[in-house]
Each structure stands twice: as C-alpha cells, then as structure tokens.
Amino acid sequence: MKVELCSFSGYKIYPGHGRRYARVDGKVFQFLNAKCESAFLSKRNPRQINWTVLYRRKHKKGQSEEVSKKRTRRAVKFQRAITGASLAEILAKRNQKPEVRKAQREQAIRAAKEAKKAKQATKKQTTQSSKAPAKSAQKQKIAKPMKVSAPRVGGKR
C-alpha cells in the first residue's frame, strides 16, 4: 500500500483518496482534498494556516512529550601533572604568595648572572694564557707589491 503525503497540508493520503495536480512545468502535486488544493492554488502559505502539519511544526505543537531537552556535554576542568613537574609541585607554586615568587625569581637571576661572570672570567684567563706565547712566535707580515693597472682613458661612450 503506497501512502503519499499532501503537498500542502502534509497529511497522509491513502489509496483511493486525494487529487493530483500537474503543473505546466511538469511538477506533480498530490492534495488530500479540494480544500488543500484550493488553498495551494490561491498561493496560501501552509506555515500560516493552523491545521497544517507545517504550521504545527513551526509553532512546536504536540512535540513536548516526544522530545526531551538535549543534554550538552560540558568541558570539565581536570588537573594533572605535566612532564617535569608533579601535580603537588604545580599546586604549591600556584599557592605561593607573590612576594615569595618575586624573591625566588630575583635569586635565580642573581645566580645566573654570577655563573655567567664566572664563565667569562675563566674564558679570559684561558685566552690570555694562550695568547702570551703566540705573540712572540708571530712574524711580521711582508707587504706584497700591488700591481698597478694603467689609467683608463675615455668615458663609457
């Protein structure tokens, strides 16, 4: 049994019922009854007519028992350890007072500067000790005679 849908009202049309309307452009419409057909031909909007399925869908009639509100999944904050720092360390750092944090930062900067100075001092000592014997061993460079080309005469053109 082939059940069709009314092109205007959206109701089911059972075999032996309804009317078929074929437009000049070849499009075929099925109507439940003359009421639907006349409303369609007078170009009425089925969304604005109370008894049509489209109106009921638009104004959410008779759907409340079928569809319960969809639950959306919320993102939940979750704390976990990061590589190189355990969760306890992270929480301890977060709970520190700003003064303590500032003092630690300054101390770390001071230590880094001292390490840099020490490194530069050792570098200087090594360069001085290696340069001293090298100076006496150096010979004076002899200036090479440069070839002087003949002066150019005339312009480019």
Swiss-Prot record:
InterPro entries annotated for this entry? Answer: L24e/L24_sf (IPR038630), Ribosomal_eL24 (IPR056366), Ribosomal_eL24-rel_N (IPR000988), Ribosomal_eL24_CS (IPR023442), TRASH_dom (IPR011017)
Chain intervals with Low complexity compositional bias: 123-145
**GO cellular component annotations, sorted alphabetically?**
cytosolic large ribosomal subunit
Q: Which is a Pfam family this sequence falls into?
A: Ribosomal_L24e
Task: Tell me where it resides.
Answer: Cytoplasm
Q: Where is this region: Disordered?
A: 95-157
Where does it primarily localize? cytoplasm
Q: Where is the sequence biased in composition, kind Basic and acidic residues?
A: 96-117
Q: Which GO terms describe its molecular function?
A: mRNA binding; structural constituent of ribosome
Q: What highest taxon heads this organism's lineage?
A: Eukaryota
Q: List the disulfide bonds.
A: none
GO terms (BP aspect) = chordate embryonic development; cytoplasmic translation
Identify the keywords attached in UniProt to this record, alphabetized. Cytoplasm, Developmental protein, Ribonucleoprotein, Ribosomal protein
What happens without the gene? Embryos show various defects including smaller head and eyes.
Q: Which Gene3D superfamilies match?
A: 6.10.250.1270, Ribosomal protein L24e (2.30.170.20)
Q: What does this protein do?
A: Component of the large ribosomal subunit. The ribosome is a large ribonucleoprotein complex responsible for the synthesis of proteins in the cell. Plays an essential role in early embryonic development.
Quaternary context: Component of the large ribosomal subunit.
Concerning its family, UniProt says: Belongs to the eukaryotic ribosomal protein eL24 family.
Task: Extract the PANTHER family matched here.
Answer: 60S RIBOSOMAL PROTEIN L24, RIBOSOMAL PROTEIN L24
Q: Which protein, by its recorded name, is this?
A: Large ribosomal subunit protein eL24
Native species of this protein?
Answer: Danio rerio (Zebrafish)
